[in-house]
């Protein structure tokens, strides 16, 4: 790795705190729209037209997203693309791989922290503290 990793600060989410206000705003934003979630195959978005609704577990009347399901053709294509990607990934050196994961960790600790936490809370009916724990496990 390029440098010694540091732990992220623990956020308290107390009433009126900046992080509490941020998570509330992000939850409101995500609840205000219904998104389309395509299959991602070889880096390309694939909209199959065969969808199921993704609802909030504690509020089945609220649809967060329409998820496009993969059929046989999409599954075969995705498996083939994954095997090809594995071959490319093997050729990347350890230092470069570490940089990729460090960039992901930086995004999750920064700009994407509230977005991922809000999504976890809505899609899995978790508290903000449970979402924070899940997010920290992604860093590993």
Question: What residue ranges belong to the model's regions?
Answer:
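Glycine-rich loop-to-alpha-helix module at the N-terminal edge of alpha/beta enzyme cores
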Residues: 49, 55, 61-138
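Hydrophobic face of amphipathic alpha-helices that form TPR/SEL1-like repeat modules
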Residues: 1-64
């Amino acid at each position: 790795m390029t440098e010694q990793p540091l732990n992220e600060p623990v956020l308290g989410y107390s009433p009126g705190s900046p992080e509490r206000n941020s998570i509330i705003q992000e939850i409101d934003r995500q609840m205000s729209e219904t998104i389309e979630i395509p299959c991602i195959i070889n880096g390309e978005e694939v909209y199959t037209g065969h969808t199921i609704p993704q609802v909030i577990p504690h509020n089945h009347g609220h649809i967060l997203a329409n998820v496009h399901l993969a059929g046989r053709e999409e599954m075969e294509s995705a498996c083939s693309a994954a095997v090809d990607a594995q071959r490319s990934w093997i050729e990347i050196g350890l230092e470069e791989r570490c940089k990729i994961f460090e960039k992901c960790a930086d995004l999750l600790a920064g700009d994407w922290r509230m977005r991922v936490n809000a999504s976890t809370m809505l899609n899995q009916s978790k508290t903000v503290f449970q979402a924070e724990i899940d997010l920290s496990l992604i860093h590993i």
